[in-house]
């Protein structure tokens, strides 16, 4: 039996989600593999200077920043973080080597950025493959390092970046997109009109799904306050009950439904006509998989590793990119213009993303080499 480690952390929800989705598909396929999910944060906790001085893990600080929208200057913060990672590289390698002593693995699968050099140096004799959970790399030293390893890339842009850094083509595997949970490939049969009525919505109004990750975002009430366009909205607030209560208590010009944490995102997307959120690779890919045109913003507060995603949306003609959600009404007029909407939706329908089902075959191939 082959033994694989899937390495993730919880700085943002996409890394754990991708690891779990891939593991679920592999188990469903009945492959004779033993998969261990490895939380990198737990291994490196002794080196976490934020935890040492504040009692709060670095990944938790990052998640609070996302929730509060404190992302201005994040590009400069990334440079600072990379400096700290270089400073503590030796300690990271030491802790990882101790962890690997628990048993040899046939393949280490990294679903995290920033730490791939430490992963490579800590286990040099074992094949390492990094699966990019972003549409593209944010060089230098983010996803793609100059080292002997394999890479799985969900876009042509990421493949080009890997080749430009000198990785041989036989070490690079392209897929048709980002890893999505298997539930996004299962049909949703609920009657849209009936379900909208059940939620207190108008069955005929254009319906937007507003989603900003597992903790919501402070921009969601601003969106609710500013909208005057002929539309209605489903707000998903995640584990942020305070935000959900605030939205429920708002007087809005449109019908709305507010949900807290839910695993039924495909259901709510089935009830929706378009998506509004941050340009995260997971949310965008989920919306496109459900054939929803998207609306996002790009400005100085946008995370640097997510800025390319807005270019991808415009390049593929999948929706509207705003400078700020203060322009939400103008953005909705553009998105919901009849000819624009038909084109955006047709382009979304034309994209077929089967990455989560493609990757197991690529991992099998790597272990046969």
Predicted regions and their residues:
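Conserved N-terminal ligand/cofactor-binding loop architecture of enzyme catalytic domains
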Residues: 21-99
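Active-site and donor-binding regions of nucleotide-sugar-utilizing enzymes
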Residues: 68-166
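A nucleotide-sugar donor-handling region in carbohydrate enzymes
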Residues: 149-207, 212
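Donor-nucleotide binding loops and adjacent catalytic segments primarily
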Residues: 193-197, 201-271
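Acidic donor-binding loop of glycosyltransferase active sites
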Residues: 255, 270-283
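Short hydrophobic beta-strand element within catalytic cores of glycosyltransferases
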Residues: 275-277, 293-303
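A short, well-ordered alpha-helix in the C-terminal region of glycosyltransferases
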Residues: 340-354
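C-terminal alpha-helical cap of glycosyltransferases
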Residues: 353-369
């Amino acid at each position: 039996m082959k033994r694989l480690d899937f390495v993730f952390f919880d700085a943002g929800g996409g890394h754990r989600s991708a690891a779990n989705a891939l593991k679920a598909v592999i188990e469903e396929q009945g492959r004779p593999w033993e998969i261990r999910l490895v939380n990198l944060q737990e291994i490196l906790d002794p080196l976490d200077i934020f935890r040492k001085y504040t009692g709060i893990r670095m990944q938790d600080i990052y998640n609070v920043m996302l929730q509060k929208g404190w992302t201005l200057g994040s590009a400069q913060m990334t440079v600072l973080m990379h400096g700290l990672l270089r400073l503590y590289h030796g300690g990271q390698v030491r802790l990882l080597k101790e962890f690997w002593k628990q048993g040899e693995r046939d393949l280490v699968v990294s679903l995290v950025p920033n730490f791939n050099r430490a992963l490579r140096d800590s286990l040099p004799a074992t094949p390492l493959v990094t699966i990019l959970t972003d549409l593209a790399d944010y060089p230098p030293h983010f996803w793609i390092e100059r080292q002997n390893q394999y890479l799985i890339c969900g876009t042509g842009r990421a493949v080009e970046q890997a080749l430009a850094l000198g990785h041989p083509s036989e070490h690079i595997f392209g897929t048709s997109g980002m890893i999505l949970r298997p539930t996004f490939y299962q049909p949703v049969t609920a009657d849209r009109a009936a379900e909208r009525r059940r939620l207190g919505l108008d069955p005929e109004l254009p319906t937007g799904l507003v989603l900003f990750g597992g903790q919501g975002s402070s921009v969601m009430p601003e969106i609710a306050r500013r909208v005057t366009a002929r539309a209605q909205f489903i707000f998903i607030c995640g584990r942020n009950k305070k935000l959900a209560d605030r939205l429920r208590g708002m007087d809005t010009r449109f019908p709305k439904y507010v949900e807290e944490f839910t695993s039924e995102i495909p259901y709510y997307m089935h009830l929706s006509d378009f998506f509004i959120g941050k340009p995260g690779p997971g949310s965008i890919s989920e919306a496109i998989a459900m054939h929803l045109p998207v609306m996002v913003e790009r400005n100085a507060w946008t995370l640097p590793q997510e800025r390319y995603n807005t270019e991808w949306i415009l390049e593929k003609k999948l929706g509207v990119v705003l400078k700020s959600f203060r322009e939400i009404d103008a953005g909705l007029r553009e998105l919901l213009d009849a000819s624009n909407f038909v084109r955006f939706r047709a382009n979304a329908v034309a994209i077929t993303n089967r990455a989560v089902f493609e990757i197991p075959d690529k991992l099998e191939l790597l272990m046969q080499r």
